[in-house]
Amino acid sequence: MNFLNFSMLVFAYLLGSINSAIIVCYIFRLPSPRSVGSGNPGTTNVLRIGGNVPAIITLAFDILKGLVPVVLAKVLTGNEFITACTALYAILGHIFPIFFGFKGGKGVATLIGTLFGFSWILGLIFVVTWLCVAVITRYSSLSALVATVIASFSVIFTSDLQVATPFLIIAIIILVKHKGNIQRLISGQESKIGDKAKAKNDSN
């Protein structure tokens, strides 16, 4: 691996480590997303805590954290596998941020950015899948999980297995991070889109 490729991976991880949910809640003087609602510092929890504006800002920045390094890797390296690995490192930064004690979000919004950066078709597959499941079920977590699996596996059909492997690893990590959501979906206790945040120990 040359210096450029290594630099792209480091840049992706460090950018991914900037947790916008925590920063946005601090700027808007909202409770920390790590102590309210689901306890997850991500877009959905910010939406429950502070409403549309903070959530949109959080979502936009988290998407950019995935989009920017992947586009740069694509342009600068011209290597699909390195670009896919850059996507993986951006996700790892978001989920295990060095700046926040390695305790971050669940990676879905950043995944959207990496998918659009890698191929707009993959990004579109994710968004359409998410919207369809969300409209039918009103479960943000279920929508994210289904969209993550479908979009990540779709890389196999747009590239080869080696290039798809980092995205398949991303899908596995995101599924594991949503273990609690999956358990609550099964038990019927998962919050739906539009539900207000509660104290962490009373919430999903």
Swiss-Prot record:
The chain crosses the membrane at residues 8-28, 53-73, 81-101, 116-136, 155-175. It is a multi-pass membrane protein. It comes from the Bacteria. Its main location: membrane. It is found in: Cell inner membrane. Pathway: Lipid metabolism; phospholipid metabolism. GO terms for biological process: phospholipid biosynthetic process. It holds the Pfam family G3P_acyltransf. It catalyses: an acyl phosphate + sn-glycerol 3-phosphate = a 1-acyl-sn-glycero-3-phosphate + phosphate. The keyword Transmembrane applies. It is an enzyme of class 2 (transferase). Probably interacts with PlsX. Belongs to the PlsY family. This is Glycerol-3-phosphate acyltransferase. It comes from Francisella philomiragia subsp. philomiragia (strain ATCC 25017 / CCUG 19701 / FSC 153 / O#319-036). The gene is plsY.
